[in-house]
Amino acid sequence: MTGSDLIGMMILAAGLFAIGLFGVLARRGILFQLVALEVALSGPALAFVAAGAYHADPQGQGMLILVLTLAAAEVAVGLALLLRIRRTAGSDDSDVISGMKG
């Protein structure tokens, strides 16, 4: 992998992170926010793999496995909370949830 390949991958990783962050901030539905958070987490994962490939170091792939594991745990907890909130509030809109007391 050349330096220009690494720069391209880092730009792509930053773009994925920015798109995911925008999705988390712009959408009100919790399900869409979870999907956007997954897109945001794929950016740093791509950066880890690209940096590891550039330096011929397998630690980048190890970090990818860690990021994917954390993302899977985040989705599991997020979906469980989403189901509970939908039963309680009747909606998955984050504005409705912020007004809940208790």
From Swiss-Prot:
EC number: 7.1.1.-
Bilayer disposition of the protein: Multi-pass membrane protein
Alphabetic keyword roster: Cell inner membrane, Cell membrane, Membrane, NAD, Quinone, Translocase, Transmembrane, Transmembrane helix, Transport, Ubiquinone
Record keyword Cytoplasm present: no
Gene Ontology MF terms: NADH:ubiquinone reductase (non-electrogenic) activity; quinone binding
Cell compartment(s), UniProt: Cell inner membrane
Major subcellular site: membrane
Tagged with keyword Transport: yes
InterPro entries in UniProt: NADH_UbQ_OxRdtase_chain4L/K (IPR001133), NUOK/Mnh_C1-like (IPR039428)
TM stretches of this protein: 6-26, 30-50, 63-83
Gene Ontology CC entries for this record: NADH dehydrogenase complex; plasma membrane
Enzyme class: translocase
Catalytic reaction equation(s): a quinone + NADH + 5 H(+)(in) = a quinol + NAD(+) + 4 H(+)(out)
GO biological process terms held by the UniProt record: ATP synthesis coupled electron transport
Complexes and interactors: NDH-1 is composed of 14 different subunits. Subunits NuoA, H, J, K, L, M, N constitute the membrane sector of the complex.
Record function comment: NDH-1 shuttles electrons from NADH, via FMN and iron-sulfur (Fe-S) centers, to quinones in the respiratory chain. The immediate electron acceptor for the enzyme in this species is believed to be ubiquinone. Couples the redox reaction to proton translocation (for every two electrons transferred, four hydrogen ions are translocated across the cytoplasmic membrane), and thus conserves the redox energy in a proton gradient.
Family in the record: Belongs to the complex I subunit 4L family.
Protein name: NADH-quinone oxidoreductase subunit K
Species: Rhodopseudomonas palustris (strain HaA2)
